[in-house]
């Protein structure tokens, strides 16, 4: 909050314009699967890494990985919230003789406390329910409740104590969501007030370069590690393994989950409460519920993945429907439009949001390693768990190439979806 949100507020106080390249770079960690982040940290900061800092497999590494995700998230959310504040209010305060500190305390903060609380709540929820980051970077010293819960379910099969822990976790997450539920709309990206600011000061340019360098450093280390240590034998091993078939299964499962998600959110009229209810379930809890109901298999896998893609999709579609007036479709009906014509009209209105759902849903499914590793049949794994197994079996070169292929698939999905904008 301090490093990400503080930069967003400081840019407004010093009237710095939005830098498109910086916004794009700050979005990169949000779209990265956790396994890619942990592997990048190992390749860059591990004992055999480019910068062997000897911080891995400790709580410090877990905290740094959380910061890698959440500092950009805080910046983007609060930058959006700040941009919705009219510059005229600050200009009026400045004309009345208010300095920057007074403008911060009397103009900005009173209008930002709701986005601040909402952003803090989301960061807490993400860190509290994270599984892959503490599992791969924390070792036994950095295990969290989510990792402990996973071990009790799938390693020790102590379902009774696992259910009690899951209920405690659910009550904590539910309480946080109940508190920040009314703040979600305030932190969603929407129409902003245009900012007519001048050129960026050198100090903010320098800060932007530092932030961008810290974001790109693990990824660059990951790529350098692949190029320097992967051989042609690794490529042939990957091609002759089950990775290609697992990648094809991942694509098919992703297409099915996205189709079901878009159909459900378009046909249904889900409210924010339904989305919050699903958000209260952590990935390990979701997989545990489906594992108990239907066992291990693709029915459980697709059902659990739907429960992870539906919340963000429900929030996005509800927000989009609020952007156009309800009487718009009523007018079309009064003018004689058939049911099918009204459906096509709403599809046209919601087309940008549908593309966002495809991108977010695809990234969640392709990048998932928690649910898919627990529910996918052992003989038919998906791509991400398979790549994780390769890395865990000390075949780093082959596993890194598999992760790179998955990352390219995510980039292709995002590029294709947004390139179709009219």
Question: Residue ranges of each PLM-predicted region?
Answer:
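Membrane-interface segments at the starts/ends of alpha-helical transmembrane spans
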Residues: 53-55, 148-161, 235-245, 389-394
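Short, charged juxtamembrane terminal tails flanking transmembrane helices
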Residues: 95, 418-422
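Glycine-rich helix-loop "coupling/hinge" segments at transmembrane-helix boundaries
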Residues: 132-157, 369-396
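Feature of multi-pass inner-membrane transport and sensor proteins
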Residues: 87, 102, 140-146, 175-203, ...
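Short glycine/proline-centered loop/turn elements that form peptide/ligand docking sites
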Residues: 85-89, 195, 324-328
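Short hydrophobic faces within alpha-helices
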Residues: 28, 91-94, 162, 319, ...
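Glycine/proline-centered hinge or cleavage motifs at structural transition points of membrane proteins
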Residues: 96-98, 110, 335-337
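Membrane-water interface segments at the C-terminal ends of transmembrane alpha-helices
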Residues: 1-83, 111-138, 164-181, 201-228, ...
């Amino acid at each position: 909050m301090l490093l990400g949100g503080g930069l967003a507020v400081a840019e407004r106080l010093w009237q710095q314009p939005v830098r498109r390249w910086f916004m794009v770079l700050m979005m990169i960690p949000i779209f990265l699967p956790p396994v890619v982040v942990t592997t990048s940290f190992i390749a860059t900061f591990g004992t055999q890494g480019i910068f062997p800092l000897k911080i891995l497999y400790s709580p410090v590494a877990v905290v740094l990985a959380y910061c890698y995700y959440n500092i950009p998230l805080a910046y983007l959310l609060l930058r959006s919230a700040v941009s919705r504040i009219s510059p005229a209010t600050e200009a009026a305060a400045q004309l009345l003789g208010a300095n920057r500190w007074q403008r911060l305390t009397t103009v900005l903060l009173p209008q930002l406390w709701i986005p601040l609380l909402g952003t803090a709540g989301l960061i807490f929820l993400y860190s509290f329910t994270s599984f892959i980051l503490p599992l791969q970077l924390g070792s036994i010293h950095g295990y969290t409740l989510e990792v402990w819960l996973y071990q009790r379910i799938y390693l020790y099969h102590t379902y009774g104590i696992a259910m009690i822990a899951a209920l405690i976790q659910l009550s904590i997450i539910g309480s946080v969501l109940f508190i920040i539920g009314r703040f979600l709309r305030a932190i969603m990206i929407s129409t902003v007030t245009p900012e007519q600011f001048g050129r960026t000061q050198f100090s903010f340019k320098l800060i932007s370069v530092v932030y961008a360098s810290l974001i790109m450093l693990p990824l660059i280390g990951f790529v350098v590690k692949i190029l320097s240590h992967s051989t042609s034998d690794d490529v042939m091993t990957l091609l002759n393994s089950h990775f290609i078939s697992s990648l094809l299964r991942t694509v098919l499962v992703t297409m099915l989950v996205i189709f079901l998600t878009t159909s459900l959110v378009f046909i249904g009229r889900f409210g924010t409460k339904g989305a919050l209810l699903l958000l209260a379930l952590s990935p390990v809890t979701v997989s545990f519920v489906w594992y108990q109901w239907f066992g291990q298999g693709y029915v459980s896998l697709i059902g659990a993945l739907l429960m992870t893609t539906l919340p963000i999709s429900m929030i996005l579609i509800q927000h989009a429907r609020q952007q156009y007036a309800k009487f718009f479709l009523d007018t079309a009906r009064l003018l004689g439009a058939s049911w099918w014509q009204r459906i096509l009209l709403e599809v046209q209105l919601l087309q940008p949001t549908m593309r966002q759902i495809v991108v977010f849903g695809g990234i969640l499914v392709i990048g998932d390693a928690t649910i898919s590793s627990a529910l996918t049949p052992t003989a038919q794994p998906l791509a991400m768990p398979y790549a994780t197994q390769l890395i865990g079996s000390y075949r780093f070169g082959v596993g890194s190439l598999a992760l790179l292929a998955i990352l390219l698939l995510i980039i292709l999905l995002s590029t294709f979806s947004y390139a179709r904008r009219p």
